[in-house]
Amino acid sequence: MKFVLLLSLIGFCWAQYDPHTADGRTAIVHLFEWRWADIAKECERYLAPKGFGGVQVSPPNENIIINNPSRPWWERYQPISYKICSRSGNENEFKDMVTRCNNVGVRIYVDAVINHMCGSGNSAGTHSTCGSYFNPNNREFSAVPYSAWYFNDNKCNGEINNYNDANQVRNCRLSGLLDLALDKDYVRTKVADYMNNLIDIGVAGFRLDAAKHMWPGDIKAVLDKLHNLNTKWFSQGSRPFIFQEVIDLGGEAIKGSEYFGNGRVTEFKYGAKLGTVIRKWNGEKMSYLKNWGEGWGFVPTDRALVFVDNHDNQRGHGAGGASILTFWDARMYKMAVGFMLAHPYGFTRVMSSYRRTRNFQNGKDVNDWIGPPNNNGVTKEVTINPDTTCGNDWVCEHRWRQIRNMVAFRNVVNGQPFANWWDNGSNQVAFSRGNRGFIVFNNDDWALSSTLQTGLPAGTYCDVISGDKVNGNCTGLKVNVGSDGKAHFSISNSAEDPFIAIHADSKL
């Protein structure tokens, strides 16, 4: 009995790090600004059959409507109430999505904006996505309700301007956003009520927006009020998966490690460093990736949520700077995402974006505010083209063959060790995941031609980067692995996709 009790305690303590994905699924996708109706369809027609574990959705709560500039993406990070009512859909549409996605084994993770309400400079009125009245000037949010007492103005009535002062970062206003007093039990209860409504509907967990701007103890107090996950889809006693947005590139007062007790943290160094390596900036080479992960000063693998780019830094916001790779850099981007999905470090998130017209002035994209594809503010449907790509300016990187097939690769090699590393001292590298998968990259300016130890059983394999295994045949390159586990690889430096990946399920 003691042993069982101990196990259940350990299970309880560790639950917030577990994404609760179905049957060995190892990656989630951020369907940024998608409508709930489109996500429900995508779970059924694509994400479930292709092995995706879950979806991070945009903030579902009521937000301010900003008309200057016209309906920017960032208006969704300015809450007005906790009603589920946004340009992605209403509460019934949200419930339908969660039910349909869970029913096919795809989890939903909500982007929870709980540090603040809208910006202090906005005018009073009902210009919100559900028409709720608010008055930022006197801190009135009647649909919650919050009043001035529930904000941090008595601790700090100005902006954050010194990131070496932890008190300022956590008590002052982030970009003018009214900072909630999460040390007050009333505020904690209102936030927990919102999150519990979502948990009861069936979500599996939360991204905590702006976690660095909240005290870890205040976050814990909110998490302690949360319900267990809905037993219709999750085992009894399951706790919500938590990943906290903590931008810690080093050199500031606040460290990501302060948040480990609450859940995982977003490792922003990951995409920034990987981008620098793939771009070959600052003398970086892929051969240096041999000790990728903790060896590069990242948080421990079981505390990391990793990504190549996110909705902020793909448009120059947040963290990472110019090295961040995005869909605009398609060739390098596919290599970076391929490396991430092949490497065992961290829990992985794939980005799915929308296109906009960029306009660089003095190195800054002055169009970085533009919201999702829309008709007069109504978000456009995600249409699917005959070639399985998306229309209406939705990029759908998660549907690119090279990325979708590497999500499957990660599932196949799950739990296998990082092994059989090879490099040429420059930008040609390869490694296996035990005896289940092997990947090789050529990011040099000359051809790769080498016989390498794959660690895989003998046979003919289909390269899942150049093609697919269909009815026992391969639409791309074939790789022959000998009885000694070795195979010959040739990759031109001018190849559209200068990498090859094979795995147990791609064996012909």
UniProtKB/Swiss-Prot annotation:
GO terms for molecular function: alpha-amylase activity; calcium ion binding; chloride ion binding. Residues 1-15 form the signal peptide. It catalyses: Endohydrolysis of (1->4)-alpha-D-glucosidic linkages in polysaccharides containing three or more (1->4)-alpha-linked D-glucose units. The gene is Amy2. It is found in: Secreted, Extracellular space. Gene3D superfamilies: Glycosidases, Golgi alpha-mannosidase II. This is Pancreatic alpha-amylase. Its EC number is 3.2.1.1. Binds 1 Ca(2+) ion per subunit. Chloride binds at R207, N310, R349. Its main location: secreted. The active site is at D209, E245. It comes from Rattus norvegicus (Rat). Keywords: Calcium, Carbohydrate metabolism, Chloride, Disulfide bond, Glycosidase, Hydrolase, Metal-binding, Pyrrolidone carboxylic acid, Secreted, Signal. Its cofactor is Ca(2+); chloride. Disulfide bonds join C43-C101, C85-C130, C156-C172, C390-C396, C462-C474. The keyword RNA-binding does not apply.
